A protein has these predicted regions:
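Terminal domain-initiation and capping elements
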Residues: 1-120
Length: 120
């Protein structure tokens, strides 16, 4: 087993608690389904939110998905002029036998524009 990192992001429509919870649910579900992984494979997850998203902690949404005993951390993404607004990001550290080349990162909705180099 190796320690690997999975990345993902999603853009939500507004600073709304329900939209943040739904966005994280969609992002985490897609990321872990695409990589055939579960909470048992996760070492830790770091979430960031752009400064315009303050209605809920992204980690709270992950807890609701069953990541109860996984160390989770939230932070604010740096406020760069012209950066895409309303984006939630995740960096998940996982244990897996897969190589880096076998991992699939997930950039959803408008956030897909952040990584045009990745396959859909």
């Amino acid at each position: 087993m190796a320690v690997r990192a999975l990345r993902g992001a999603i853009q939500v429509d507004a600073n709304d608690r329900d939209l943040i919870l739904e966005g994280i649910r969609e992002l985490i579900t897609e990321l872990f389904d695409r990589n055939d992984m579960s909470a048992d494979d996760v070492i830790s997850m770091i979430f960031t939110a752009t400064p315009d998203l303050t209605a809920e902690f992204p980690a709270y949404a992950a807890r609701r998905l069953g990541f109860d005993d996984v160390p989770l951390l939230c932070a604010v993404e740096i406020d760069v002029a012209g950066a895409m607004p309303r984006v939630l990001r995740v960096l998940a550290h996982v244990e897996t036998p897969k190589t880096r080349a076998e991992l699939h990162h997930s950039y959803l909705r408008g956030a897909a524009a952040l990584r045009r180099d990745l396959p859909a």
